[in-house]
């Protein structure tokens, strides 16, 4: 029988707790209870809640990077890659309650750690998009533009369509979101042939 990885057990329990209760309301006691370990076990791996939260963010960010890199095919056009990455990230977001909870906590309480966590996630996405936009610009697939500005705008559009819209309307399907990305981006930055 394989040994139990207590550290991973703690991380999974903390992820679950942060996703259910948010950063502010999560306690080490809750994490210990969910992980079915003593509170002291948590402190053998993490000195405090902030360090545990940071590790979870590192894992989430790495998972998102892996998704993006897996879905980018060098032989494919920029927009084909964009839509593949978008599909996968939409599925990831749907299945990852932590990011949704952090956004809600930031909105409701303005928790600094929630803001910093979401900012880290956004920076990784922005850096990735900026690099891909630069490549697309160099290959002539998109018009001359500032990749950082376009990356920022793409992230805001993504958040608007996947989250902000849902506050007052029925959520958009993946196909609708892709359709709006096509409408707003391809007609705006795609090279006209």
State each model region's role:
Residues 1-21, 25-37, 50-51:
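Basic, helix-initiating cap at the start of DNA-binding domains
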Residues 19, 43-47, 55, 59:
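Base-recognition residues in the alpha-helical recognition helix of bacterial helix-turn-helix
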């Amino acid at each position: 029988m394989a040994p139990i990885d207590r550290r991973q057990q703690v991380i999974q329990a903390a992820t679950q707790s942060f996703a259910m209760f948010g950063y502010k309301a999560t306690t080490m006691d809750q994490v210990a209870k969910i992980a079915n370990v003593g509170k002291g076990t948590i402190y053998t791996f993490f000195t405090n809640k902030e360090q545990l939260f940071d590790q979870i963010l590192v894992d989430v960010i790495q998972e998102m990077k892996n998704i993006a890199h897996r879905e980018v095919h060098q032989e494919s056009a920029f927009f084909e890659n964009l839509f593949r990455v978008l599909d996968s990230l939409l599925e990831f977001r749907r299945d990852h309650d932590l990011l949704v909870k952090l956004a809600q906590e930031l909105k409701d309480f303005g928790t600094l750690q929630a803001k910093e966590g979401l900012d880290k996630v956004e920076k990784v996405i922005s850096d990735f998009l900026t690099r891909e936009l630069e490549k697309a610009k160099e290959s002539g697939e998109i018009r001359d533009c500032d990749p950082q500005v376009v990356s920022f705008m793409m992230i805001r559009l993504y958040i608007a369509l996947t989250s902000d819209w849902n506050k007052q309307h029925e959520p958009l399907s993946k196909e609708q979101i892709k359709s709006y990305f096509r409408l707003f981006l391809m007609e705006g930055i795609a090279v006209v042939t």
